[in-house]
């Protein structure tokens, strides 16, 4: 059990983990969750739902597969969850990195950091939505670049167009996040967020 394992770890260990929510969250709900989290657990990546169908339509679930995280705990994969188009899509919600300022003129809210609020979850939710739509549009506007990334069986231009159609019809929602923090911080966040799945990706010693 991953929760039990995390409880045995000292807080000088940094844990990188992928967390799955019990239900999809809107971008405003995600922003509100970040503000409720007193530990301000760093969210490294927000996974955005890009499809909503099941492989096994008769029973409404996919064929169950399993994997193991770095703790050795068995993690059920694709069990009753809608299939996602690959590659998965998402965004980094903190606005870190170096950008050319001019890019925001063509692609609104490509850069998040100057605009994020410490108190307004509605504003941040709208920014997340705009930012993600912009990221998709950047990819859609550069088909020649996408061709350099394609394997023999993929068409990324069609893929990003499909994702754009999906979020237009269904909204932008997240089914999980990747976080980095101490075991106790992650456990507190899981309780606050209603997390139902934890996949530990990496353990490192904290430098603090």
Model-derived segments and spans:
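Extracytoplasmic/luminal low-complexity segments enriched in Pro/Gly and acidic/polar residues
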Residues: 126-208
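Generic structural motif
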Residues: 22-26, 51, 182-184, 203
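Short proline/glycine- and acidic-rich turn/helix-capping motifs at secondary-structure junctions
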Residues: 49-61, 203-208
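A short beta-strand structural signal in non-transmembrane regions
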Residues: 15-21, 177-179
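N-terminal, intrinsically disordered low-complexity tails/presequences enriched in Lys/Ser/Pro
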Residues: 1-13, 24-31, 38-49
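Low-complexity, serine/threonine/proline-enriched polar segments
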Residues: 55-151
